Amino acid sequence: MTTEVLASRQTKARDIERDAHISAWSPLALAERARLPDSLIRLGIRRLCAERLRTERGGNLESAWERFRTVLGDLGTSSIAIETEAANAQHYELPPRFFELCLGHRLKYSSCFWDETTADLDAAEERMLCLYAERAQLADGQHILELGCGWGSLTLWMAERYPHSRITAVSNSRPQREFIEARCRDRGFANVRVITEDINRLQLSSTQFDRVVSIEMFEHVRNYEHLLLRIADWLRPGGKLFVHIFCHRELMYPFETDGKDDWMGKYFFTGGLMPAADTLLHFQRDLNIEEQWRLSGTHYEKTANAWLVNQDRH
């Protein structure tokens, strides 16, 4: 599920090393070489997810709560985000052409919105972007900060929809900044500024933004309290933060890199966190949550399946 609240791969050499005991003919190796059909890959994914859920739900209610509290405590001693260079290598510094072939027209690299009236991926992207604007209470003339702007789906949508707004977009990826800036030049948008910076080092002037929006970036964050303190400083009086984050209904856990089956943590989401739906409710010292919405995980399922169709087509 996801929740919303208002308040060719470039890698390092170590990233492509595989555990010595993993055979070239293991299921993981075969999947990486596209030698397995999607049906078998899905079966393996379901098995790994089921194993993780059994581990996280093991024991009684008290032990599950203690695990949750331990993760909460670890977040408070971490830097804002970890393994930011790995995230770039795994996702954000791939050539934009790959994403143009896989994603929709807006290049939205996050969940889209589907219902019985949604015709296709392009329409699903548009539906979710409109939903963000409604729930974040965006309006023309605002100064808006987007943290983790990706390939510019929301940034460019806002620039088009709100020509009198000033939009500051932040990404840790140079290719993403260059891509968005090129799109702005092509479309004549003069109201967008793109900053390339690691979120740990991002420095901005106080009390300048009416809105801060962040779409599926908080999953890369560990120290929510520290980041929310900074965001509170960047917001003007009366300003609001809107966050879209994928999550589990009840469980919170980091993606580890120490097991032979931890493919996701090692090669796709290093340093990432699976937050629980109520995680941000535990971090309201500097910003108070006014509203929270939950969306079914089927929206992401349909989005990912549409990406897969595009990828297979090309």
Give the location of each predicted region:
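N-terminal accessory segments
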Residues: 1-87
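Conserved Class I S-adenosyl-L-methionine-dependent methyltransferase catalytic core
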Residues: 52-135, 139
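Conserved class I S-adenosyl-L-methionine
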Residues: 141-150
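Conserved SAM-binding loop of SAM-dependent methyltransferases across substrates and taxa
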Residues: 151-163
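Conserved SAM-binding strand-loop segment of SAM-dependent methyltransferases
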Residues: 186-201
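A short acidic, Gly/Pro-enriched loop at the edge of an enzyme's catalytic core
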Residues: 200-212
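A short glycine-rich, Lys/Arg-flanked "PGG" loop and its adjoining helix->strand segment in the class I
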Residues: 225-240
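Substrate-binding/catalytic lobe of Class I Rossmann-like enzymes that use SAM or dcSAM, i.e.
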Residues: 247-249, 253-314
